[in-house]
Amino acid sequence: MANPKAKMSKSRRDKRRAQFNARTKAATTVICPNCGEPTLPHRACRHCGQYRGRAVVTKSANS
């Protein structure tokens, strides 16, 4: 059976495990209070451009 040549540090171990968790867990979404579309938490809404009641991203007229 294979044995490790050197001790793996906690940070290196956790970095490896983080990749598995990032791929298996679904992204958390919240409902935008302004337009009602699902969006990522703590980020501006992709549909209306608002974050915490303020317009932070201006939407162009043709989109």
Curated annotation (Swiss-Prot):
Keywords annotated in UniProt: Ribonucleoprotein, Ribosomal protein
Gene Ontology CC entries for this record: large ribosomal subunit
Keyword hit for Ribosomal protein: yes
Record's compositionally biased regions (Basic residues): 7-18
GO function term, MF aspect, one: structural constituent of ribosome
Keyword rRNA processing: no
Pfam families named in the record: Ribosomal_L32p (PF01783)
Residue span of region Disordered: 1-22
InterPro entries: Ribosomal_bL32, Ribosomal_bL32_bact, Ribosomal_zn-bd
GO biological process: translation
Domain of life: Bacteria
Record-stated family: Belongs to the bacterial ribosomal protein bL32 family.
Name this protein carries in UniProt: Large ribosomal subunit protein bL32
Organism: Chlorobium luteolum (strain DSM 273 / BCRC 81028 / 2530)
Gene designation: rpmF
